[in-house]
Amino acid sequence: MDIHQILIKYWGHTEFRPLQEDIITNVLEGKDTLALLPTGGGKSICFQVPALAKEGICVVISPLIALMKDQVENLLKRNIKAAAIFSGMTHREIDITLDNCVYGNYKFLYVSPERIETDLFKARLEKMNVNLFAIDESHCISQWGYDFRPSYLNIAKLREYKPDVPFLALTATAT
């Protein structure tokens, strides 16, 4: 399916909003991209559509459990396979979720910046067919990365595991 067919099938829209198609095209061309769109501007579609257009899984780094759960719920309502790993899950639940990602049972995996630093995640990441790293609310890198959540500064280390996978940073509030 091309990106327009994906947009119609899963979201019921016939046209992209301004800049969405340009961002999606950049991602599909394998380019690292910064998407600066207003709140309500459809940032999620900018990583969801290209991830659905390609083989593999999109790893989404998100700052808040509530955001992860909301995104996963919205994808599941559209019959798109997605999962999130967050604090409070048992080791077994995390292990099963990551295995399902390795075996191609999900198109989207939502994780926190802290999760990507764990040995278990790194080991499974090497085995995943990742098609995109999406950093949602990427302004948190500079706002929180230097003191409150230093794990944000280590997101770039994912490049060591998947050097050919593009990164898409999304925000409404970059300054």
Residue locations for each model-derived region?
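Conserved helix/coil segment N-terminal to the catalytic DExD/H
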Residues: 41, 48, 89-132, 140-146
